[in-house]
Amino acid sequence: MIEEHVHFNSDGLKLEGVLSYDENVLNPLIALLCPPHPHLGGDMENNVITALGSVLAENGFASLRFNYRGVGNSESKQGNIAEVYEYWESILNRDDCSDAIVDATSAMNYLESAIDTKNMFIAGYSFGAVVAMMLSVANANIRAFASISTPFGRFDTTFLSDCKKPKLFVCADNDFATSLEEVEMGMQNISEPKILDIMNECDHFYIDKEQEIANKALRLFDSNSSA
């Protein structure tokens, strides 16, 4: 497996990412991986995101994980670290994904141009799960998505009421970010086809469960990869 550090432009900013792929696969499927909020472990080296990238790349996908603006070495429009912190704190307080969706869209456009395929998938974790879901609704080329630790209690899921794409929701039974009651209520707004997978004796961070989660996403993507 090759991991290639790449850069792409988003809203006038240079963002960083890591493209993972098997050089022996000539026509890979592609998958974009959206990390969580930077104040909650959210960069492209997050344990869940890196596991997804590795497992997918080892199974015929080219995956791109990336850092949102102001995270890691990705540029921002703020002048210093304190301003970047306040920027992301305001996003967390307002549950505002708009800039992150712009960055994820730019990442997807880069990935699509780099690999030259329309066979696309997306996965996101926590805050990134919401970004991935919103991008899935907006982008007709995305075949299916995996949403991990979706913060059901903070975001309205009715925008998925007409989404007919295959959807996987992985949730922990002891997740501080959302309760099982909130998961159940949120799932009621989401159309079929959908899969809810609740992982027992697990919390929001999925320590030692990363490979299991990645394989769940892989199965969903593989089962929906045929033209």
Annotated model-derived regions:
Residues 1-7:
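A domain-start/cap signature at the N-terminus of enzymes
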Residues 8-117:
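Serine-hydrolase catalytic machinery in alpha/beta-hydrolase-like enzymes
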Residues 99-164:
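Primarily recognizes the serine-hydrolase "nucleophile elbow" in alpha/beta-hydrolase
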Residues 110, 216-227:
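C-terminal alpha-helix
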Residues 163-164, 168-171, 175:
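Short beta-strand/loop motif that positions the catalytic acidic residue
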Residues 173-178, 204-205:
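Acidic catalytic loop of the alpha/beta-hydrolase fold
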Residues 189-205:
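Catalytic histidine neighborhood in serine/cysteine hydrolases
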Residues 202-214:
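Catalytic histidine-centered segment of alpha/beta-hydrolase-like enzymes
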